[in-house]
């Protein structure tokens, strides 16, 4: 049996770090769905300047895209593009890319490809994992934190962008994620909400680990 853990939540809530540490604890494969969207955004931005996301040319290009994943790295044409996915430009562009239904379907297909490669367990983090990608997940988690706390965390990771700009970006992204037509950020049915404002990463991981053990035992 392949166990599945879905971790959803807004930008900066600690999904990626939590999933990475859980992977080390459980020995499961992890998928960062946000990185896949960022990879699509990066390839589109670097291949087509000012791409018309509604054009047939772009749709056909996206449908042929393929990526591979190795731990936390994303490979495109056998090149590791992970270091290019966290720029301010991609931060802004990915929210537009993620709104398009055909791109969401493509990312879903890629996620399913990665899921099939796992024979023990899978941890997927994103914004619509418990609702659309893994509705049958063994455990569904929704990580949350206040915008100010999330902005502080992001600023510590990327001090090249001011705290004020980081906070404004998070508030804007929250609105976009929660109001988009397809794959909106919501708490999945049956998900356990964990507010991480006053919790360390280790405390969050311990809590999810205990919840998972209770589920499977």
Curated annotation (Swiss-Prot):
Keywords: ATP-binding, Kinase, Nucleotide-binding, Transferase. It catalyses: CMP + ATP = CDP + ADP; dCMP + ATP = dCDP + ADP. The keyword Kinase applies. It is an enzyme of class 2 (transferase). CDD domains: CMPK. It holds the Pfam family Cytidylate_kin. Its EC number is 2.7.4.25. GO terms for molecular function: ATP binding; CMP kinase activity; dCMP kinase activity. HAMAP family: Cytidyl_kinase_type1. Belongs to the cytidylate kinase family. Type 1 subfamily. This is Probable cytidylate kinase.
